[in-house]
Amino acid sequence: MGMQRNEYTQSQKMMVFILSMSLFGLANLFTELLPEFTIGPVELSISYLAFIPLTLVMLFNPWYAAFGASVGEIIFGDLLLGDFGGLGELEGFIEFTLAMYIAGLLVTNLNSRKQIAIAAIVGVMIDQMLSTVVDVGKVWFGIEELEAVPGLPASILAIEGVSFVTEMVISGVLFGLIPALYLIPKLYGKIEPLLGIEPRQGRVKASMTEWVSVRFVIIAVFLMFVAMISEFMATMDINFAVWEPEFLEQFGEGYIWLPISAAAVIFVSVVIAAVKFSKSRTGTKSRKSA
């Protein structure tokens, strides 16, 4: 059974954006508390909990969910922790937003675990591949010197290749694909009504050729060019809007609980507002039908 693309009101778009921003921001803060492990030349750490934005971009409007997640990472994971790299942050912002947006577009049937799995892997893969290309480019163009890793060949391709594989296993599979395959079927049809949004039924009528148009490809390539240039400039110390205040150090490691509390309060507030909004819409429809 086909369906038309879901139409969102401005309030619904804002709620999806804030929900994604606060939830992924909160998740990023918790990853800061998790330990890192080193096995030989390989560093094992959780860069981000990919299943959260992946779940949101598949259940809701991909653009607002992806954009909200990227903003949440910057606000709660960088700015409030005093670790904002200025212009250099633009690279990660563009790459992650683009990757999650494409992942959301790839899913046309939320009842298909195969589609969910492919979209989840492709989303994280795009993010990691774009980041790898930029890192390799910085060394090849002589902008940054190669930092040799003991136990690995002194080759940027080998170093970045190992990093790419570990990120795909940890962020892509363990904390991306597996949780998403479990959560999406559980949440599908239950969380959307909270925002007054009709759950997606069947397949979207628009084909991938309509989504991935020439215009979309041109914009994506242009954004990647901007991301690469911004990272190159930041590496060459041509940077601005950096926010790394020294006074935050006096609060010690316990300071992280302040942004965690802020993100949690925003998330709970959005959920409460969404429930009230849904109830008011239901009440209005009931009165009209009566």
Task: State where each predicted segment sits.
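Membrane-helix interface "capping/anchor" motifs
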Residues: 56-69, 108-115
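Membrane-interface capping segments at transmembrane-helix boundaries
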Residues: 186-194, 273-286
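Hydrophobic alpha-helical transmembrane segments
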Residues: 14, 18-22, 63, 67-71, ...
